[in-house]
């Protein structure tokens, strides 16, 4: 299911929110409306955590995570880090990384198995992705768009890239990630897909301006609504299958 929401009048819900299969982070804000919508959809399945990162609300652009772990920038305070450790499930590892490209959500897009990253991220950050998020890492750019986290979003079921991404680049990414890739937009034509929406394996939240056509593309590529929330058993089966293939 894909839902339209806004964060205090902003359509850029991916700027203020990080959504994975095991937790959801939401930037602290003045209104409860956005938070309450996410709570209503997610709280039976995963924790929805109100937090700031580096004393800002733009948690979606500063963090990157999946069901295995969460990476936060070096500017994250000790209090914020402790709050996250107390709020997230025990099996979710958290690490603070010293990365020059500190808006991690702009330069990294990942699911539970693979990550595509900006060509210039440090070797230490790449190592943290492997160790904490347990993903295979590929350095790519989407034609002229090196900020892969802003112009691309992926789940375990599919990947949505900016509309002007060349077909050969789409095919290359599909071959690397081993999931379907389609080009599209959100928020009535915006190519900043990572900033305009968040998605996990069973639900997506898109900006309020997103058209019904854009929502149908999102539901199709991410296979939303075809099944309920994945169980821990299905996750373990997929992990076992991938380990046996490596």
UniProtKB/Swiss-Prot annotation:
Keywords: Cytoplasm, Initiation factor, Nucleus, Protein biosynthesis, Ribosome biogenesis. It is found in: Cytoplasm; Nucleus, Nucleolus. GO terms for cellular component: cytosol; nucleolus; nucleus. GO terms for molecular function: ribosomal large subunit binding; translation initiation factor activity. SUPFAM superfamilies: Pentein. GO terms for biological process: assembly of large subunit precursor of preribosome; cytosolic ribosome assembly; maturation of 5.8S rRNA; maturation of LSU-rRNA; miRNA-mediated post-transcriptional gene silencing; ribosomal subunit export from nucleus. Pfam families: eIF-6. Signal peptide: none annotated. InterPro entries: eIF6 (IPR002769). Binds to the 60S ribosomal subunit and prevents its association with the 40S ribosomal subunit to form the 80S initiation complex in the cytoplasm. May also be involved in ribosome biogenesis. Involved in miRNA-mediated gene silencing. HAMAP family: eIF_6 (MF_00032). PANTHER family: TRANSLATION INITIATION FACTOR 6 (PTHR10784). Monomer. Associates with the 60S ribosomal subunit. Belongs to the eIF-6 family. This is Eukaryotic translation initiation factor 6. It comes from Caenorhabditis elegans. The gene is eif-6.
């Amino acid at each position: 299911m894909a839902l339209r929401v806004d964060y205090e009048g902003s359509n850029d819900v991916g700027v203020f929110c990080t959504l994975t299969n095991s937790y959801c982070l939401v930037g602290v804000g003045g209104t409860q409306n956005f938070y309450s919508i996410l709570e209503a959809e997610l709280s039976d399945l995963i924790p929805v955590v109100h937090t700031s990162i580096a004393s800002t609300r733009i948690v979606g652009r500063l963090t990157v995570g999946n069901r295995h772990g969460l990476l936060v920038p070096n500017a994250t305070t000790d209090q914020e880090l402790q709050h996250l450790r107390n709020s997230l499930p025990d099996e979710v590892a958290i690490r603070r990384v010293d990365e020059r490209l500190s808006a991690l959500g702009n330069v990294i897009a990942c699911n539970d198995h693979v990550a595509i990253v900006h060509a210039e991220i440090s070797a230490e950050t790449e190592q943290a992705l492997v160790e904490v998020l347990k993903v295979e890492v590929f350095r790519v750019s989407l034609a002229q768009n090196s900020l892969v986290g802003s112009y691309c979003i992926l789940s375990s079921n599919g990947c949505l890239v900016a509309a002007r991404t060349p077909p050969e680049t789409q095919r290359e990414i599909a071959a690397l990630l081993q999931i379907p890739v389609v080009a599209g937009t959100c928020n009535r034509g915006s190519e900043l897909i990572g900033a305009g929406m968040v998605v996990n394996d069973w639900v997506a939240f898109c900006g309020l301006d997103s058209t019904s056509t854009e929502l149908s593309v999102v539901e199709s590529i991410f296979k939303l609504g075809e099944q309920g929330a994945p169980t821990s058993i299905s996750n373990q089966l997929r992990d076992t299958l991938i380990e046996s293939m490596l």
